[in-house]
């Protein structure tokens, strides 16, 4: 298992969020998730301006193995999407915590962050899934 950056928060469904200034939340999927999915072949991104509620489907990724919904970790408005993924979905496989980010959400309820998993808690979820 790769190192999990300490500045991230997670959903049990393997999405991560990195909080920046001005209530901006960058969202992607974990290294564990991209490993499970295998080689990604398609990413359906949300539209800029879309309103997302925490826990609802925000995007869809498809691999050679399966399609998987990506859930929004926070409530807010999509203000940016990673258009690189349209042509190079494998960027998520190559750099899930960096260049493989999926979208940026302007959070409307920053307090939701406290409901998300810390890197240590997420690691425990992964370890319990393996047994």
From Swiss-Prot:
Belongs to the GcvH family. Coiled coil: none annotated. Binds 1 lipoyl cofactor covalently. The keyword Cell division does not apply. Residues 24-106 form the Lipoyl-binding domain. The modification N6-lipoyllysine is found at residue 65. This is Glycine cleavage system H protein. Its cofactor is (R)-lipoate. One of its GO terms (cellular component) is cytosol. The glycine cleavage system is composed of four proteins: P, T, L and H. It comes from Xylella fastidiosa (strain 9a5c). Pfam families: GCV_H. InterPro entries: 2-oxoA_DH_lipoyl-BS, Biotin_lipoyl, GCV_H, GCV_H/Fam206, GCV_H_sub, Single_hybrid_motif. It comes from the Bacteria. One of its GO terms (biological process) is glycine decarboxylation via glycine cleavage system. The glycine cleavage system catalyzes the degradation of glycine. The H protein shuttles the methylamine group of glycine from the P protein to the T protein.
């Amino acid at each position: 298992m790769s190192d999990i950056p300490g500045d991230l928060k997670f959903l049990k469904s393997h999405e991560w969020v990195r909080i920046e200034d001005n209530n901006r939340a960058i969202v992607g999927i974990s290294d564990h998730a991209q490993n499970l999915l295998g080689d990604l072949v398609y990413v359906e991104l949300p539209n800029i301006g879309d309103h997302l509620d925490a826990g609802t489907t925000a995007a869809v990724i498809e691999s050679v193995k399966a399609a998987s919904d990506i859930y929004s970790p926070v409530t807010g408005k999509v203000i940016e999407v990673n258009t690189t993924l349209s042509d190079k979905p494998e960027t998520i496989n190559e750099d899930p915590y960096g260049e493989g980010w999926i979208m940026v959400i302007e959070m409307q309820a920053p307090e939701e962050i406290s409901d998300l998993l810390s890197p240590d808690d997420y690691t425990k979820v992964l370890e319990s899934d393996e047994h």
